[in-house]
Amino acid sequence: MDLSPFLLEFKHRNKMQSVEVRPCCKEENVIYYDIWIDNQYQYTITPGLINGDKPGWRIALKNADKTVDQDLIQTIGVEIESYYL
């Protein structure tokens, strides 16, 4: 799998979003993705279980002063999956 950074553009809440995704590391076959919006680091996400029971995307690390939109994280995760398909 290519771990080069890539751009995603998609619609979220009726607004176009542009996100840079930087795959940053791989541990035990799990890849972590740094998410950059407007050239600013927002958070690192990874696939995993949400609330311990359903598959989805979760935050592995975040910038303390940034708010987190859980719906946006799930949308970005789906877009990452689509990018690799």
Region locations from a protein language model:
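Intrinsically disordered, low-complexity acidic/polar segments
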Residues: 17, 28-30, 44, 54
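Intrinsically disordered, low-complexity linear regions
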Residues: 16-18, 30, 69, 73
